[in-house]
Amino acid sequence: MFVWTHINKYTSRYINRYILKFTRYESLRLCMLNFTSTIKNENKIYSKKNFNNVLMQNIKITEDEEIICEQFFFSKYNLPYVLKIPFSDLRLIDTCNNNHNPTILIRKDMILLRTGFLSCVIRYNELWLFEPREPLVIKATNLIKQNLKIIYGFKGDMSSGVEIPLNELKDEKCQENVNMYEKNIRNDLYSTYEKNISDDINDAKQKNMCSDINNIWSNHIKIDKKRIISGNYSRLNRNNIWENDREINKKDIFNIKEKKNMNENDDICNKIKIVGKEELNNNIKEDINYLNVENNFYRYKGNISFEFLCLDICMQLSIKEYENYLDTINITLRQKIQLQQKKEENIEINMLTNNLLREMMKIKNKLQKLSNLLNALRSNIEKILKNETDMKNMYLTTLNKISINKIKDYSDLEILLETHLQLTDELSGELENMEEKITHYEELMRLNLDYNRNKFILLNAKISFSTLFCSICAVITSLFGMNLKNFIEHNDYAFFIVSIFITSWSIVGIYFTKNINTLLRFFDKYNVK
């Protein structure tokens, strides 16, 4: 602070005073003013408070079953006191600390989760998420709020579009739902009757349709004639179905359009399916079921635990992020392999470039890092599945009301954890396949490198032998070019003999250079060095 105050005084007294005089040089003046303004605002940009503050996302359920979603700024020094967790546990799940692998810590009244992409603190009625501005955290927040609105906002509402299994409800409630369903169907039938009934009806057509209906009723269970429920009539065309109240008359005919082909005895007693409001459309269901794993247990069951819902969504989003990250690496790897194959098909120089080796090393390092994260997450899930005490301590909502000794069945939590364990196993299998692919590709590159190295060694040997034979011929011809007595100057056949010798020697040199492998085998056989 002492240095910055002196710099500010110096700039305000001297620099700004002389800069303002350069009115003619507008660009220079603006550049200097921008420089001095950045110096003045340096303390605001690099203040210590910005490095120590942490933004947190809080999702809380009140006693009135109201959902509160807020964001808070906390200091790192006050964060353990606000979250009521020790510094050692906070250090393991802090997103700013990249030295720790994914962890799942089970404490007495909370679950601490770090998946590599998400970090959160889960209690029986609230959730704290780190880095709420991250896209994955925003998506997790929206999914949790949507599920909570379905659970608390539309629980028991028949128009909410939620499927309720009847085996989890009491008989009275089941009967009420059946009666309500029949009442709605009956009202729809009477409304269609008022709109579509016509006075002029062909007698022959009416009798044929009535005979078909009598054949169908003989195969189904008898019901009250006053009650009209849509059935699954496979023998009729599904355009028009005619029904009679007491006797088949021309005036008491109902026109029933195609609504839903539902078997009365099977579908009504097994499942009540109600067309919901616009709030639960297909897009919301796809977002909630983000992976192929359907979390129907948490959406449809009566006793829903808030902590399991948050844990399920955070784990699903994190595993999906691992899958996307693995797909991007797989795409880049395929591109590199296809590029190398195209080069080989085009008969280019089959050499390994430095850039290709560096990229393969980067891909291998990324896979190794991803493998470490997935193995750490798998090991944490396996430890929890083996420890019964941790499994019981994860029932935070139940432990808020009863003691831990009364918890005997935790099969629902086992299903949740084993589901995510299976997903991590599948990702680990894909990662191992990619590592094997990279290892195979590296072996091919090594073979390619050895092949090219042998070609260069062979070329070097050919050049050496050709140089040797050519140098011998050059030495012989150079002897005749000197002004020395060789005692064959006066011989008429001297030039002819020397020319034949040099030509034959050149032919021998060309032959051995071309068939250098036989020469190398000869040297190896007699240990010629």
From Swiss-Prot:
GO terms for biological process: magnesium ion transport. Keywords: Coiled coil, Ion transport, Magnesium, Membrane, Mitochondrion, Mitochondrion inner membrane, Transit peptide, Transmembrane, Transmembrane helix, Transport. It is a multi-pass membrane protein. InterPro entries: MRS2-like. Residues 336-388, 416-450 form a coiled coil. Possible candidate for an effective malaria vaccine as determined by epitope response in sera. Residues 514-529 are mitochondrial matrix. The chain crosses the membrane at residues 456-476, 493-513. It is found in: Mitochondrion inner membrane. Belongs to the CorA metal ion transporter (MIT) (TC 1.A.35) family. Mitochondrial inner membrane magnesium transporter required for mitochondrial magnesium homeostasis. Involved in the development of the sporozoite in the mosquito vector midgut. This is Mitochondrial inner membrane magnesium transporter MIT1. It comes from Plasmodium falciparum (isolate 3D7).
